[in-house]
Amino acid sequence: MNQITTQYITENGACYEQYVITDPAAKTSLTITPERGGMITGFTLDGDEYIWTRRPNFSECNRPRFGVPVLFPSCGNPDGGVHNFEGKAYPMETHGFADLCAWDVESVGPDGVTLALESTPLTKFLYPFDFTLLVNYNLEGNKALISLTVINEGDKPMPFSFGYHPYFVASALENVDFDIKCATCSENAKGEQPAAPEKITLTRKAGADNTIRLLTGVQFPMTFTDKGNGHKVTVDADETFDKGVLWQQDAENFVCMEPWNGWANSVNEEGRHEVLDVDEAMTSEWSITIEKV
């Protein structure tokens, strides 16, 4: 049976409450930090950490570039850095704003930890809609289970996209081998997308500080194995996700393998985003499985 405990950590003078779900039989633990974007900030197997943390970014006010950020109401950076609703342009952060907000603890129990984020006057300055987000985290052996429910609390249809940006520990990029099946693979989501090669790889060009692969028609699960540290990570997702992103930057010891629901400008493009009618809700589910090989 899982155990759920709380702990407090201090980063650069800031104190954060964390919820830790532990499966003693599987020797796994999942750490969630509600105040830091309501996200996963740790996932260990037999004491070995699989989620990468960038310090001092943990305690900074800017966008988290570590852990498992929740992306809402968009993924990536929209054209011009704005969303256009009813003829008006609204500024939008890269990957939306959910990862910048402190989330409230909705419930803690046998079904895991559920956090809530509700619209405020500040979020409506960026995104003129009333909403509630509920994210649930649970642990099943060596698998973290994550669900996101989006609720339209307003009086008009609500457009959005969503996704996640997990940072996984990696010994070195050249040690990481991917097992992914998808329809297309490119470095830019604009225009016609080239067919994916039989083998998906992530390599950095000479002189580049980062590397990216944008995938469509992903046949989940996506998996990578790191021959340097013996980690195997599997990301599985339901039918609400059909896109994936692989990313790595600055030769840091991480690799991102991300499930996305939309592209950077999807919310501005007709037919390329989700729309919830008044009082409607939508739930998506995905998981992270960690293994030692």
Enumerate the language-model features and the residues they cover:
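Extended, loop-rich substrate-binding clefts of extracytoplasmic carbohydrate-active enzymes
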Residues: 1-13, 84-140
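Beta-strand-rich N-terminal accessory domains
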Residues: 1-69, 73-82, 89-92, 218-241, ...
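Acidic, contiguous internal or C-terminal segments within carbohydrate-active enzymes
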Residues: 21-23, 34, 119-160, 164-166
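A short, structured loop/turn motif at beta-sheet edges
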Residues: 106-113, 138-143, 170-173, 248-252, ...
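Beta-strand-rich interaction surfaces with strong enrichment in secreted/lumenal proteins
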Residues: 134-136, 211, 271-276
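Active-site/ligand-binding surface loops and adjacent short beta/alpha elements
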Residues: 157-159, 166-238
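Active-site pocket scaffolds in enzymes
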Residues: 231-293
